Amino acid sequence: MKLEIINSQIEAGQKGLQIFKQAIQQGAQVFGLATGSTPISIYDAITQSDLDFTKFISINLDEYKGLANNHPESYHYFMNKYFFSKKPFAHSYMPNGLADDLKSETKHYDQIIEENPIDLQILGIGRNGHIGFNEPGTSFNSQTHIVNLTDNTIQANSRFFDSIDQVPKQAVSMGIASIMKSKEILIAAYGKEKAQAVKEFIEGPVTEDVPASILQKHPKVTVILDQAAAALLSKK
């Protein structure tokens, strides 16, 4: 696990861009993408660069159940706003949260991942150590699955909605085993509210109580942290 401690979001974006460039130089063609505030600075740097993704494939981590693709809080909308409208891919895959049969959708999505192994996966981490929508207690062997969001995650996401009642209670998420198949992983965290989760996933035991802790077992992980998120680490 390689740690990169940065002083600003702009610096984080440049670090992320550098990792994308290196991956492409090494032959990467399939990129696993994430949503939320954490990757925005990286996406900003990428979309302002000269990188061309028109021959590549993107596969997103997750999507809420029940939100239309054009809903401002859907992850389809997010990705179009921050990435795809500026840097399109040959194919962009995202879970279909509107599917009539979500169970079939999860199997279909696993097939997509199987046919398009991810070269570089972007991740954020939740305050409780979740990655994607894989909440504490999720099996490390999990594939793409339907998730019942925890009260903490619903509360954290409520800032994006007019009221907490509008926050979706379920999502479709790539599983932890699916994520771990990626050849390379870039995970980022910023702010003091992430410091405890960062300490636990980097220095704590590998446990399903902290889903991100499984990344200790992955052969190629880069962690981008600001000073606040890294504050509780004993080794930096």
UniProtKB/Swiss-Prot annotation:
It is an enzyme of class 3 (hydrolase). GO terms for molecular function: glucosamine-6-phosphate deaminase activity; identical protein binding. GO terms for biological process: carbohydrate metabolic process; glucosamine catabolic process; N-acetylglucosamine catabolic process; N-acetylneuraminate catabolic process. It comes from the Bacteria. Keywords: Carbohydrate metabolism, Hydrolase. Its EC number is 3.5.99.6. HAMAP family: GlcN6P_deamin. Signal peptide: none annotated. Catalyzes the reversible isomerization-deamination of glucosamine 6-phosphate (GlcN6P) to form fructose 6-phosphate (Fru6P) and ammonium ion. Pathway: Amino-sugar metabolism; N-acetylneuraminate degradation; D-fructose 6-phosphate from N-acetylneuraminate: step 5/5. Pfam families: Glucosamine_iso. It catalyses: alpha-D-glucosamine 6-phosphate + H2O = beta-D-fructose 6-phosphate + NH4(+). The active site is at residues 62, 128, 130, 135. This is Glucosamine-6-phosphate deaminase. GO terms for cellular component: cytoplasm. Belongs to the glucosamine/galactosamine-6-phosphate isomerase family. NagB subfamily.
